[in-house]
Amino acid sequence: MNTLKAGATYVGEGTTEHGIRYVEVAVPAVGKGEDVKVKIIPTKAAGDVLNSCTKGANLLIGGRLYRNRAVQGDFNSYLIPTKRIELLSSRIPLNEVTIAGAYWLNDNDIKANQTSKERHNFTILTSAPQQPLLNHEYDDTISFSVTSWKYDAERILQTAHTGRQMIIEGYLRSYTPAGSDTGYVSVTVRSGLVEMFGKKKEKEGSKISKPADVSKVVIQGESKEELPI
């Protein structure tokens, strides 16, 4: 599971390096931070609103989040709509993400966790339906950088282990380091909205050497409405 529901502002249209049309929107920041840029791949499910929008239009969007595997070094977030995009009369502060998958720590997580005792950074590896335009296959995984705080961070530290299945609800956050043209998008866990499944600890000698358990995540197949136009 890798879904986003959010209010957003229409920014404009463009094409990827391999010629795929997208519509860029800005999702409002929660608290401090920048608006989050998301690129929408138009689908039948989205309806025809995106064809008549002007810059600054307020939208309600919903769908699955992906990365673009077709272009190396493309770190943008892409949304495949699963429901009709609505035109709103005013901006709404909605930014909700649900991610389910396998717990994982990469080198950046480990480094970040050394600087704070109240924060725990980790990665969730999840699966998603095939999206040929983004070169995403059923066997591919999508990684989401996640930040948890205080009680949630402590609980995850005590009960999570590599490969353990979990589900979180949170919001997208964007951060661009000083002097950099590239921003980083992560998910921040909302207080108390994290659940883990399966055994709390691995059995002795059963350590996971690679994130193979992602395949255990249940995937809902895409409908005809989710297919790109």
Question: How would you describe each model-predicted region?
Answer:
Residues 4-11, 55-67, 82, 98-105, ...:
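OB-fold and OB-like beta-barrel modules that bind single-stranded nucleic acids
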